Amino acid sequence: MSVEAYGPSSQTLTFLDTEEAELLGADTQGSEFEFTDFTLPSQTQTPPGGPGGAGGPGGAGAGGAAGQLDAQVGPEGILQNGAVDDSVAKTSQLLAELNFEEDEEDTYYTKDLPVHACSYCGIHDPACVVYCNTSKKWFCNGRGNTSGSHIVNHLVRAKCKEVTLHKDGPLGETVLECYNCGCRNVFLLGFIPAKADSVVVLLCRQPCASQSSLKDINWDSSQWQPLIQDRCFLSWLVKIPSEQEQLRARQITAQQINKLEELWKENPSATLEDLEKPGVDEEPQHVLLRYEDAYQYQNIFGPLVKLEADYDKKLKESQTQDNITVRWDLGLNKKRIAFFTLPKTDSGNEDLVIIWLRDMRLMQGDEICLRYKGDLAPLWKGIGHVIKVPDNYGDEIAIELRSSVGAPVEVTHNFQVDFVWKSTSFDRMQSALKTFAVDETSVSGYIYHKLLGHEVEDVVIKCQLPKRFTAQGLPDLNHSQVYAVKTVLQRPLSLIQGPPGTGKTVTSATIVYHLARQGNGPVLVCAPSNIAVDQLTEKIHQTGLKVVRLCAKSREAIDSPVSFLALHNQIRNMDSMPELQKLQQLKDETGELSSADEKRYRALKRTAERELLMNADVICCTCVGAGDPRLAKMQFRSILIDESTQATEPECMVPVVLGAKQLILVGDHCQLGPVVMCKKAAKAGLSQSLFERLVVLGIRPIRLQVQYRMHPALSAFPSNIFYEGSLQNGVTAADRVKKGFDFQWPQPDKPMFFYVTQGQEEIASSGTSYLNRTEAANVEKITTKLLKAGAKPDQIGIITPYEGQRSYLVQYMQFSGSLHTKLYQEVEIASVDAFQGREKDFIILSCVRANEHQGIGFLNDPRRLNVALTRARYGVIIVGNPKALSKQPLWNHLLSYYKEQKALVEGPLNNLRESLMQFSKPRKLVNTVNPGARFMTTAMYDAREAIIPGSVYDRSSQGRPSNMYFQTHDQISMISAGPSHVAAMNIPIPFNLVMPPMPPPGYFGQANGPAAGRGTPKTKTGRGGRQKNRFGLPGPSQTTLPNSQASQDVASQPFSQGALTQGYVSMSQPSQMSQPGLSQPELSQDSYLGDEFKSQIDVALSQDSTYQGERAYQHGGVTGLSQY
């Protein structure tokens, strides 16, 4: 079979799928998916080239089958009597005479392939394929249409690590393993060329390749290289198929590989054809921007919560570990504590620790089941709560047993641990969604409509504002904090954006203080994580308010800075209930109570809990903790959720449905968002926070503007890039010069530099993360130099985006650091994500990524870069490969900025010199009106979303009102037509570039200008009784028209655009978009509105029904202060 058969001269069309659908999702609204006709063409419409067409057997003349059929068709298009049988027979005969040539690609794969053919593409050259010992399947070393080879793709996705080469390959049937220790994890294996010719030695990265004993046998450990580079096995080990072979092979996309791997988990013998079966790949409904009512809201979010719950359960219940060795101890509360480490595997301890910490998110309070399976004692099972997780000091996990009865404390071996999955948090989210839908009293009418995205007139709460906004016991507030507190107290729904170091916690505590002083019952304060709740609880307590910290019962044994405020500890100290104290003392001493005493103890405890909660000024708990049964019968008028951008929307709803009439969301959508483990749920929108959606709906957050954390030189770049230059410095350069610290910065007045490192990335032992040994060595040298210069270990933080690098750094510091091991143990090494909300005096950032083809992964996420750059108070040092990083526009800006500041350096640390490396000129988001936004600024949404019909950024409406309060976007920071190619490149832009200005709120009954009351806009109410909210404030049906709409009669203009409302826009006619100062002809001729850009928009907005259709028409006539 000749190569030409597949070349340009062949008559066979071969269609190759690209990975674009994997990246952007299929364009189901595009023209190729349009409904045309799902029936066979009529005989009179037979296409050219078919039977009867110009190229068919009955062709050019009048004599084909179609022609003969036509002759017998009557005037009304009905076949005459007797003609049917003849025509069918003749057509069948003609079709039988046709010789259809089978596509060679099809025949290539319909014939029986050998057993060792690649399970993805079918390539079966013995030199090119590798056997996966775990899944019992063969894969080739070719990339096909994916970024890595098929074997590496499989190993990573299936979490397999052991392989065997083919017996007919150049190296024979060989299991790849370490020559020294027998480790078979291919992600750990590498080779050292031996002195003898044509001999290589396979050794694992750690510990074997780093042992000093290698020198004794003439092996140079510095020459060690991994077997897998650029996500492919080295070609001398496993041959890479030729380009022709790969073109002839079955074409499979990354998206299909993903689906096939998922299918193999359930059915190992599944094939690509099985993917086509109905129901195999059902995608959940995507979240919307607006919802008709709370039932639709529940019907969309409920399945996503279930998806995440199912994924979480499957992951945690699959992680059973045998052969555990336990160390027993007795806690201060007389409870048994079991200490254990995860067993050593071929990949070393790192692999399992990563899975338990990163994938399973093991944390204090989680439940673990410990079983004894040996012969030295009776079989036993006990449940305990985790009280210690692995850290820099060791990999030990500790659990406190609920009951010590029968615990085999005399034995230490042959134990098994299982993760006990609990559905509590997911059940509470589902319950909150249901409550929101069915319970009228769950939230006020105003908040109900706002959360669903309905148009509601803004209102102001009449309240007595304090004369002095600073709370007692807390620092004085700056101007932006005072404005935030003052505004929030007067509004039913507020968003506060707190960039890094701007005093978000102090501001939140001050708001809670003033809300509590109003005497409207306890204020509920929540956050997604226990650490964030504890920090805020501590600050609120400083104001002198009565604060109760409500903990999950599984966390009562865990110590925290605010343990004395915890409900269970406050009950212990209640002098008003002596009987309860006696029973508690008896329980502590004996460990158990009689059934009668236990019953009495629980009743008294419930009474005490209720009394403390009812009398508290403030109750603090996690968002999921707000679903605790102890709060079930309480109603909270005022609710504040801190770090709300790190919570999923259903998580936020758990506290919200406890009666919210005044809701304050605090967060920063320019930092990292919620963690969603299930990719399908994340892709459907569960990873978008409520805060973000409300911002897109046009509720403009109040931004805190003075930062008190960073040296001014450190805050300049994040301010310009992420916050449009709006951050002011509350500290001077002199405030951020450390006394007794002698470190030579390349620029003495700028405590920062980018240290150019040319090392290569490697896949970590888990197969799902990366590490960079050269960077790790440089990080150790920098850490040592900082310590010698006078920095204390606990003042230094090392952060990296990759768990593999974090784990490698911990081990490298211990074994290769030139100072005492204990010093390095006190240096915190963590992922960027784990450092959010934290700060250190000095931060070292290891970027890790350095490759030719793979890109830079989630370093691409601007929010991750923002978090990484804003953790330091006194100095930042970035270690990375500029060549790889500069390909991404945002990093290009960062590197160019460091070069401008003469802080891009290379060479030995004691003699740093400015790097001569040159970068292409950064692409700028040109904004002539607002020079402060000259950098490519960022947030969660990119330029394409500025034209989503239905969002606040929709520019489709004509005839903009002139009144400045009712414009749909800010004239000062509009996006000009010039940089619109940015949209096609996915370059993020800031919210403020398309954000509407904040209109003045209206008091109840206040008219908005001379046109007030001139019409009633269309409204949507989710449930009866929502027309009036619980303030007695006007619902959406009582909104008034702004004066700019006085000349338009709503009834006669059903599709006219209201002040801040969104109308229907056809994505097939982007030229209808309007911008101030830009006429229609100008815009319609602009190059970026060509087919390429249009198709990208269509792909991104494939959930077209989210924004268009009947709902868009309904919104078309709504007017008033719609977004606030």
From Swiss-Prot:
Binding positions (Zn(2+) 3): C178, C181, C204, C208
Modifications the protein undergoes after translation, according to the UniProt entry: Phosphorylated by SMG1; required for formation of mRNA surveillance complexes.
Consequences of knocking out this gene: Embryos are viable in pre-implantation period, show complete loss of NMD but are resorbed shortly after implantation.
Region (Disordered), start-end ranges: 39-69, 1004-1053, 1066-1091, 1105-1124
GO terms assigned for molecular function: ATP binding; ATP hydrolysis activity; chromatin binding; double-stranded DNA helicase activity; protein-containing complex binding; RNA binding; RNA helicase activity; telomeric DNA binding
Bias kind Polar residues: ranges: 1036-1053
Catalytic activity reported: ATP + H2O = ADP + phosphate + H(+)
UniProt protein name: Regulator of nonsense transcripts 1
Gene (UniProt): Upf1
